Amino acid sequence: MNLNIDKVSVTIKNEEILSDINANFTPGKIYGLLGRNGAGKTTLISLIASYRKVDQGSITLDGKTIYENDEMMQHVNFIYNTKEASTETDQVKEYVESHAMFRNDFDQDYAYELLKKFKIDDSKSFNDLSQGQQAAVNATLGLASLSKVTIFDEVTNGMDAPTRELFYEEVLETEDRENRIIILSTHIISEMEHLFDEIIMIHEGKVLLQETTNELLEKGFTVAGKAEKVRDFTLNKNVIKVKFLGALQIDTVIGYLGPEELEFAEDQHLDISRLALQELFISLTNDENGRD
């Protein structure tokens, strides 16, 4: 089932939160949904999950509108860290069973297997768990739902490093992966970079880009060396930041480098470094680029 977002706009209290959003998701891929605070990520997720209706445009799964469509809504699962009043005193086991009742594809055996891996005692009440353990339970519910579209919104908040690493492993190896669309909305970009097949970057309510991770990582680099040589090399390129360290100049550039340019840079004793995804994200969404 493909998920398609077509020309979606949303206005809240006379403020346009999303403007003409277009994005496409295909099964078997893990998508990184990236954006600064207030960019519109949460609003977009709430639309996919049918928490609210679009003002303009459409969101469809397998060609069918999701909003108020029970058949399609069954295939979308939105996971985020929250305490629902009805679950605070429930045992974890009861929490899992209640989710299984409302999710046709939910795999309870898989859920309990995951809880064991996360070292969660399912006889404890959800409220007695630490924040990180609660996050692990919520992550378990998302993975075990086997929903065609599973959205994790900052689900690793509160998890310690080993638990986050285990979650990442399970995302990559999750059951029925080839038929699922997994969307990860996160600010921990450096840790999750290796998970993403494609990146969708939201900035100021618009889709800044949708590209494969490999394509995107070819898009930014730094050039370091003697100031005059750096300036000559980056002339007519999209330089978004210039930094000086003594006699050394470092330019951050958005664009692609061909083999001949790389060879020329080496001849000029210039140091070329690819930007990590987090650095690239910061650079692309920074409205105050310039000199340091």
Where are these regions (language model features)?
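Conserved structural motif at the start of ABC-family nucleotide-binding domains
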Residues: 3-5, 18-20, 33
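Walker A (P-loop) phosphate-binding loop of ABC-type ATPase nucleotide-binding domains
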Residues: 35-40
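Helix-to-loop junction immediately C-terminal to a conserved catalytic motif
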Residues: 49
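Conserved ABC transporter NBD signature motif
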Residues: 57-68
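ABC-family P-loop ATPase nucleotide-binding domains
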Residues: 71, 78-138
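Walker B catalytic motif
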Residues: 151-156
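C-terminal coupling/interaction segments
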Residues: 245-292
